[in-house]
């Protein structure tokens, strides 16, 4: 029986991971970690019986201890708690699905402890790929992508040598505002931006998809996962979200992974790699589908994608600024403190003001994040 721990168990990826566990019946969940949703976390604890649970919020952790005092489970808190879950001795795979740079330290410690990583926390590689990937190689652990696009690329690379890649074709749905111009986005409200046409996701990533910043983060993530230069990653808008990504090889052949927009497929693939398992759910019906569309992304309207390429080309600490500025700006937009188009304005302002650090340490990455947050707060 495979033994796993999940960081971010109450979020979109975490809950779908537990659905995969439930459907298969041969995975033991030893550890869970969540932010503050202790009502759902209690349900998960009672069903999956983990030995160790981390809650980021200390007050909520105290409440949870009372709720589950009839169970044999240890409750821990904060960053130390996340790390304790991540390095549990019996755990074979750590699935990290927390949102933001909070996932970096637990991922580093899990790799040092020899755990394979099922990675749904793209910010870890965006900001610290130069630390994570060499460490994973040194420790002999696998980084298994859970993002649908990176899983598709990973699957399309099976049986082929990495040095034969001509380019990666990273697909995007285009989000809810595909085809719009900047002037059409002046009065976008939170509710408008949360209406993704194809995927059911968390609030932050749904906003990121609407601005195409999410795709920019995925471009940078792909460079670290697959060892390619940023300009070898080409974004292609594929509105139906049927082709999840493609790899073009030196001989001109293109291999793609297709499927319905269901995150359980890449989650299950990562948990059972290299084996495949039956997965219940809808299947593609090519007779009914009719056609697939492809478009070039509009980087003038969705300027955040252009900024991501700039951050990826520059490297160093600039991707951290890009990511941190976006995190805070999206939070402000969701709280109705700023307008939609200000998200990208804030990202660009922070990038232009930053003095780049070429090869930042983990501490410097976290300092850069804090400095970026402070700059945005000072705008008010």
Where are the regions a protein language model picked out?
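Catalytic, metal-anchored helix/loop core of enzyme active sites in primary metabolism
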Residues: 1-380
């Amino acid at each position: 029986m495979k033994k796993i721990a999940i960081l971010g168990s109450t979020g979109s990826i975490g809950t779908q991971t537990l659905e995969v566990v439930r459907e298969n019946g041969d995975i033991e969940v030893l550890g869970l970690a969540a932010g503050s949703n202790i009502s759902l976390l209690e349900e998960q604890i009672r069903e999956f019986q983990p030995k160790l649970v981390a809650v980021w919020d200390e007050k909520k952790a105290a409440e949870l201890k009372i709720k589950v005092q009839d169970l044999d489970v240890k409750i821990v808190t904060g960053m130390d708690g996340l790390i304790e879950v991540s390095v549990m001795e019996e755990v074979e795979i750590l699935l990290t699905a927390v949102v933001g740079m909070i996932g970096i330290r637990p991922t580093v410690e899990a790799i040092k402890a020899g755990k394979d990583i099922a990675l749904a926390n793209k910010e870890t590689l965006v900001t610290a790929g130069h630390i994570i990937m060499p460490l994973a190689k040194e420790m002999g652990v696998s980084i298994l992508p859970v993002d649908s696009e990176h899983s598709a690329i990973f699957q399309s690379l099976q049986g082929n040598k990495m040095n034969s890649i001509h380019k990666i074709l990273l697909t995007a749905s285009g989000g809810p505002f595909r085809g719009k111009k900047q002037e059409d986005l002046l009065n976008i409200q939170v509710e408008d931006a949360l209406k993704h046409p194809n995927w059911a996701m968390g609030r932050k990533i749904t906003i990121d998809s609407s601005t195409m910043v999410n795709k920019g983060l995925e471009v940078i993530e792909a460079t670290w996962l697959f060892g390619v230069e940023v300009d070898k990653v080409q974004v292609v808008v594929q509105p139906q979200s049927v082709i999840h990504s493609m790899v073009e090889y030196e001989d001109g052949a293109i291999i793609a992974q297709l499927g319905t927009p269901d995150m359980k497929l890449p989650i299950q693939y990562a948990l059972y790699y290299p084996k495949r398992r039956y997965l219940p759910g809808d299947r593609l019906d090519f007779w009914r589908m009719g056609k697939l569309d492809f478009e070039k992304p509009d980087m003038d309207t969705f300027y955040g994608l252009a900024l991501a390429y700039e951050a990826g080309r520059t490297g160093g600490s600039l991707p951290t600024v890009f990511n941190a500025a976006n995190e805070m700006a999206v939070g402000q937009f969701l709280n109705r403190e700023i307008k939609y188009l200000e998200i990208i304005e804030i990202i660009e302002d922070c990038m232009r003001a930053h003095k780049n650090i070429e090869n930042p340490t983990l501490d410097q990455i976290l300092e850069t994040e804090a400095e970026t947050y402070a700059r945005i707060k000072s705008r008010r």
